[in-house]
Amino acid sequence: MDIILATSSPRRINLLKMLNIKFKTVAPRIKENINETDPEKLVKKLSKLKALSIKEKGIIISADTIVYHNNKVLGKPKNLDNAFNMLKELSSKWHTVYTGVTIIEKDDIITFCEKTMVKFKKLSDELIRYYISTSKPLDKAGAYGIQELGAILVEKIEGDYYNVVGLPISRIWDILWDRRII
């Protein structure tokens, strides 16, 4: 049975390629405006909606990632000013990256959430402006990509690095392996 990654994210595609399994991608079509304040429930709901939006037959894997700080979700910034403010808010502080993952195999739906703590170093306005001008913060939750230049913003990480990138591949591998999918 085909494995389908429900995403248009190049980062998630590259991460799943690391597992050396054959898969194809289909972009999910959902509206991401869900009224949910609990970050874990939010990412699990969104990943499930993404998976269920795929009409092709196969084993479907989907994910949704958010940055959570001070009891609020920091999704993808709306513009560069919003990106600047997000990064300024995260300066010298810990935040949590949540990724909800859903795997559908026939009628079986597995949904879980992975959490990783990230601490940013003290970020000057000049460094934030430099980062924003040389990277693409608008397509990333929290306005940064840890796997790219965003690594210069990070002081510490506790948990799964790949979760911060957007796909907790070790846990996904374990589920696929245990179910004899791979």
UniProtKB/Swiss-Prot annotation:
Pfam families: Maf. The keyword GTP-binding does not apply. The record marks 11, 65, 147 as: Important for substrate specificity. InterPro entries: ITPase-like_fam, Maf-like. GO terms for molecular function: dTTP diphosphatase activity; UTP diphosphatase activity. GO terms for biological process: nucleotide metabolic process. It is an enzyme of class 3 (hydrolase). Its EC number is 3.6.1.9. It comes from the Bacteria. The active site is at 64 (proton acceptor). Its cofactor is a divalent metal cation. One of its GO terms (cellular component) is cytoplasm. Transmembrane segments: none annotated. It is found in: Cytoplasm. It catalyses: dTTP + H2O = dTMP + diphosphate + H(+); UTP + H2O = UMP + diphosphate + H(+). The keyword Cytoplasm applies. Keywords: Cytoplasm, Hydrolase, Nucleotide metabolism. Belongs to the Maf family. YhdE subfamily. Nucleoside triphosphate pyrophosphatase that hydrolyzes dTTP and UTP. May have a dual role in cell division arrest and in preventing the incorporation of modified nucleotides into cellular nucleic acids. NCBIfam families: maf. This is dTTP/UTP pyrophosphatase. It comes from Thermosipho melanesiensis (strain DSM 12029 / CIP 104789 / BI429). The lineage of its organism: Bacteria, Thermotogati, Thermotogota, Thermotogae, Thermotogales.
